[in-house]
C-alpha cells in the first residue's frame, strides 16, 4: 500500500509539526508515504489524482481503528490519498470525489490537530498490518 497525505497548509503549531514529522518518520518503516502540503483546498484533488481518496470531513463516517484497517486492506496494492482541508474545510468538489468521507471525531478539530490525529491513526493501522504490538484492541 502506498499512502499519500495531502494537507492544506504546513502545521505552524510546534506540537503538531513535530508530531506529524515523527509519525511520518515511523510510518515510512512500514509503507511508502508521501506527505504533501498545498496552499488552497482547490489544489488537493490534483495532488490525489490516480489515488483512492479519503476525505477528512466532520460529516463523514466514524470508523474504529480496526474498521479503518479493514477498509485499507480492501485497497491493498492501490495508492490511497488522505485529504485534510484547511480552517475552512473542503470545497464541495473535493467531497464529491471522495471514495470515503471519514470523520475522526464528532467534535470539530482544529485542522493541524486533525492532521496529527490522522497521522497517528495511519501509523497505528500500519503497525496493526505488520503485526507490531503498538495497537492493543
Curated annotation (Swiss-Prot):
Coiled coil: none annotated. Keywords: Cytoplasm, Methyltransferase, rRNA processing, S-adenosyl-L-methionine, Transferase. It is found in: Cytoplasm. It catalyses: pseudouridine(1915) in 23S rRNA + S-adenosyl-L-methionine = N(3)-methylpseudouridine(1915) in 23S rRNA + S-adenosyl-L-homocysteine + H(+). InterPro entries: Alpha/beta_knot_MTases, RlmH-like, tRNA_m1G_MTases_N. One of its GO terms (molecular function) is rRNA (pseudouridine-N3-)-methyltransferase activity. It holds the Pfam family SPOUT_MTase. Its main location: cytoplasm. SUPFAM superfamilies: alpha/beta knot. S-adenosyl-L-methionine binds at residues 56, 85, 104-109. It comes from the Bacteria. Its EC number is 2.1.1.177. GO terms for cellular component: cytoplasm. Belongs to the RNA methyltransferase RlmH family. Homodimer. Specifically methylates the pseudouridine at position 1915 (m3Psi1915) in 23S rRNA. This is Ribosomal RNA large subunit methyltransferase H. It comes from Thermus thermophilus (strain ATCC BAA-163 / DSM 7039 / HB27). The gene is rlmH.
